[in-house]
Amino acid sequence: MSSENTGKSSLNSFGARDTLTVGDQSYEIYRLNAVPGTEKLPYSLKVLAENLLRTEDGANITKDHIEAIANWDPNAEPSIEIQFTPARVIMQDFTGVPCIVDLATMREAVAALGGDPNKVNPLAPAELVIDHSVILDVFGNASAFERNVELEYERNAERYQFLRWGQGAFDDFKVVPPGTGIVHQVNIEYLARTVMVRDGVAYPDTCVGTDSHTTMVNGLGVLGWGVGGIEAEAAMLGQPVSMLIPRVVGFKLSGEIKPGVTATDVVLTVTDMLRRHGVVGKFVEFYGKGVAEVPLANRATLGNMSPEFGSTAAIFPIDEETINYLRLTGRTDEQLALVEAYAKAQGMWHDPEREPVFSEYLELDLSTVVPSISGPKRPQDRIELTDAKNAFRKDIHNYVEQNHPTPETKLDEAVEESFPASDPVSLSFADDGAPDMRPSAANGATGRPTNPVLVHSEERGDFVLDHGAVVVAGITSCTNTSNPSVMLGAALLAKKAVEKGLTTKPWVKTNMAPGSQVVTDYYNKAGLWPYLEKLGYYLGGYGCTTCIGNTGPLPEEISKAINDNDLAVTAVLSGNRNFEGRISPDVKMNYLASPPLVIAYGIAGTMDFDFESDPLGQDSEGNDVFLRDIWPSAAEIEETIASSINREMFTESYADVFKGDDRWRSLPTPEGDTFEWDPASTYVRKAPYFDGMPAEPEPVSDIKGARVLALLGDSVTTDHISPAGAIKPGTPAAQYLDANGVERKDYNSLGSRRGNHEVMIRGTFANIRLRNQLLDDVSGGYTRDFTQPGGPQAFIYDASENYKKAGIPLVVLGGKEYGSGSSRDWAAKGTVLLGVKAVITESFERIHRSNLIGMGVIPLQFPAGESAASLKLDGTETYDIEGIEELNSGKTPKTVHVTATKEDGSKVEFDAVVRIDTPGEADYYRNGGILQYVLRNMLKSSK
């Protein structure tokens, strides 16, 4: 990190620079008490205040900015822009590969414009964990892990060689190889410092990450959040992150959770509360006496779900529990002493008696939390477990009946247009016939839509599938697999289930993908692996797997039965996202649940199940076995944690974390400061963003004669815009791979090909569940191509190429919460590469809006209360947008004037709100994007 980022060159207007002595070590620090007013700030804003004090340069960060945060008005709407300099950047491989591709391309662009390519180097430590590429091709047997890793290397060798080149070519860039763990778990267990030391200066650890669940580290008191890959690249290159001083929601925790309630239940309850309250763009900070009762692992689970709450961060302050966790996970005694001394010196140590001032207040009595699941399509759709069967029976109608009306939804909820119901099926209602000994998902189906399908399977025997069958049960995802209480709870439940003679249903694809190798160690030490394996939960891989759609194919006979009979089947996973189409293309309904409940639903085999009154099976004596009979007690879980987890597990697991296995070490790795691009590569291609870029930006211009590429509904996620999953044969992305000699079995996923813009542009707006309202009853990556007579249906990519040839700019129209979900920079990159100049919506989710600006696309909002529907816009119009050119004079217009001319010549006119929110964002937009801005600044500073 450059000296200006550590504080060595701070202007120090407040005389805050001082020395902190801990043991026999002395550190330079910037004391917050030098700035009056900071003592009353919430913890999260103290971290920001210190950041500004230390990086004050008189230009980007001034004395006024520091005073603005010290005098923070909790009741004001955010309006003051500050420049936050994160201490480090963390990445996963799907988003990290394109970052390193961009940096490699920037080196060449700098050289081409006469600069020094070695100027392009991370100034902040950057760490990348490879966790997104492992796919569960093999499951349910002892060879699953080894075989899945083998296949991962076969598919991804090119990408991994490229990352190894990057590790050698760039300073301060490290890669954690595949098969180690999930990025956020590796972050809390090893990478996070809580207090950083660099150049002799001690300061709070902060980070930005190229994954929206970066907020997991908030549980350790580390302020950090997900940003798009483009912002992460800029942060690596020393650019501060532009932000408004946020509102902070104080979330008071009191009471203790009841027996039988898990951390997952707490986080689903908090998600539900915060979504209802509305926390988009705000910090959430937990406080109160109840904080001490929340184990660090549970804090990390709560922090992890911040994107699902809608908040920028969801943070816990530092206290004794933080220190205990750092000790358990193998941090040094010197580090522990520094964290405690620094936090106490800066007023950052949690004092339960002191109530900071917050903008808004919420409270949860933990004793009121009940077991819950969430589904069938959004994390905030919480269902109490006692009501799960009823809720499923209501929801199933939306997936099996034609034109079933979707109930009216609240402002922030998805509507029919965005998330289509399935095609109609032939409905039948169950009759009680003669008993059948085959396992069946249609038992007790009276009163709900049912379509029993007999499946013959050589491996699994004969069984009956039906609507609601659980075909995926995944213990997966960073959210829960780092949490010993739920992971050991699940394993103890498995032990009791096996002892009672229960088994997982034959149609369930099981998955166990822990977030780090430590989980495997404590399962082994506790002697619980054999029970999990008996129920089918063999180690499948250390990575995201099911949670990001790397579920792998369902067994062929099951997939065929589902698709031939249009069954609405379900997945249950211990993840954080359950959007439609995300988990598996065969599965329509997805539910989030705690790891123990994942196992329970795998045994039940259907969502049409009431755990209170329906037995999971019978024991050897024929007695009914209910969930309550196998649920482990809190005392059992605590005893197992105490006897099976120790510090040595962490120190041994992470001793050689960057070294990798033989496969990693034997990868042939190119060398040199610039990368030798392979023109035949279908994984890694030189990025096109700097092609023909002049040293000075050209003026921005108004948009004239634009056409609509897509007219979309509410809650369109970044996964709809740039899916990460499988590449469908026959689509433009598949056609490109076919033309380049790639066999269908080697297509791999869109996420794994993010280093190749040719594949990614063809995959943009290509999610199988996306509904473009320019077309009736069509899902997937299609639009109308108005360059052709009559505007026929065409692939979005093919139409965009025709518009490009004709010199016609494009716009996208959307609804509420456009761009929610993952911090997926390709959702913005793909948009700009398709020729889209503006996106007009009712509202944007935070990260995607800033990513669009970062790629030179202007985000606009309909006037308050208006929408495409209310303005009677159907997407066939031609659009002129005037007022953008005002940006050339250094001013950002509040609105621009949009004229939509219909085919009959009539006009619809409105003033769209310009969502360029800060002066820094205006600079990026004027330069055509953030990377172009950084590159031009680099050239200026090297002259």
From Swiss-Prot:
Record's keyword terms, sorted: Iron, Iron-sulfur, Isopeptide bond, Lyase, Metal-binding, RNA-binding, Tricarboxylic acid cycle, Ubl conjugation
Domain of life: Bacteria
SUPFAM superfamilies: Aconitase iron-sulfur domain (SSF53732), LeuD/IlvD-like (SSF52016)
Record's cofactor remark: Binds 1 [4Fe-4S] cluster per subunit.
Binding-site residues for [4Fe-4S] cluster, renumbered to this chain: 478, 544, 547
Functional pathway: Carbohydrate metabolism; tricarboxylic acid cycle; isocitrate from oxaloacetate: step 2/2; Organic acid metabolism; propanoate degradation
GO biological process: tricarboxylic acid cycle
Entry's EC annotation: 4.2.1.3, 4.2.1.99
InterPro entries: AcnA_IRP_Swivel, Acnase/IPM_dHydase_lsu_aba_1/3, Acoase/IPM_deHydtase_lsu_aba, Aconitase/3IPM_dehydase_swvl, Aconitase/IRP2, Aconitase_4Fe-4S_BS, Aconitase_4Fe-4S_dom, AconitaseA/IPMdHydase_ssu_swvl
Cofactor(s) essential for the protein: [4Fe-4S] cluster
UniProt cross-link Isoglutamyl lysine isopeptide (Lys-Gln) (interchain with Q-Cter in protein Pup), position: 394
Region (Disordered): 422-449
Function noted in UniProt: Involved in the catabolism of short chain fatty acids (SCFA) via the tricarboxylic acid (TCA)(acetyl degradation route) and probably via the 2-methylcitrate cycle I (propionate degradation route). Catalyzes the reversible isomerization of citrate to isocitrate via cis-aconitate. The apo form of AcnA functions as a RNA-binding regulatory protein. Could catalyze the hydration of 2-methyl-cis-aconitate to yield (2R,3S)-2-methylisocitrate.
Subunit structure: Monomer.
Membership in a protein family: Belongs to the aconitase/IPM isomerase family.
Protein name, per record: Aconitate hydratase A
